[in-house]
A protein has these predicted regions:
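Ubiquitin-like/PB1-type beta-grasp interaction modules and other compact soluble beta-rich domains
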Residues: 3-4, 17-176
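Bacterial N-terminal signal peptides
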Residues: 9-17
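Bacterial N-terminal signal peptides that target proteins for export
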Residues: 1-9
């Protein structure tokens, strides 16, 4: 009986290791530039489902945030409200041009690349040609670094080298 009990305990322990996820497993996710938009006459950020090579309407707000997301942590929109009137209200409309609000949020220190400093947010009204796309608006304000596929890797030199890397989820972002 003692031998049967010992075998049962060992078998249970082995099965538990196989079928129960270890508590020490690390959650992973991606650190990247997230792209958000707010259509004219709205102030709600919506995650862009296409890249910045789309036409944008006069009165829209374009938002970029250096963010983290994974299975356990959703990405977050820029921390500045997408309020066109607040961003561009003092900028007069010009014939043949459009006004676009631009927000660039460099994210949080908790997921900043090692050795790099999070920059100050950029909130600016951009007056641009009617045919300008999101990437044109962004490029009027700061230097854009892209990879060969067009993925935005760096804005204003941040981050300096990486491009959409997988990292361990910062503990401060995980639900407790």
């Amino acid at each position: 009986m003692k031998k049967t009990t010992t075998v049962a305990v060992i078998a249970t322990a082995l099965l538990a290791q196989i079928f129960i996820a270890p508590a020490h497993a690390e959650s992973k996710g991606w650190r990247y530039w997230g792209y958000y938009q707010a259509a004219a006459k709205t102030n709600t950020w919506v995650a862009a489902m296409t890249g910045p090579t789309v036409d944008i309407a006069d009165g829209s707000v374009e938002g970029w945030i250096f963010t983290f997301s994974g299975d356990d942590v959703p990405s977050t929109p820029p921390s500045v409200k997408a309020d066109f009137n607040q961003i561009c209200g003092k900028t007069k409309a010009q014939s043949g041009k459009k006004r676009i609000g631009l927000v660039v949020d460099f994210g949080k220190r908790t997921y900043a690349p090692k050795g790099e400093k999070v920059q100050k947010r950029i909130v600016q009204c951009v007056v641009t040609a009617k045919e300008s796309q999101g990437i044109d608006v962004l490029g009027q304000v700061l230097k854009v670094r892209q990879d060969d596929s067009g993925l935005i890797c760096g804005l204003a030199g941040y981050p300096a080298k990486e491009c959409g890397v997988e990292i361990t989820a910062p503990k401060s972002l995980l639900k407790k």
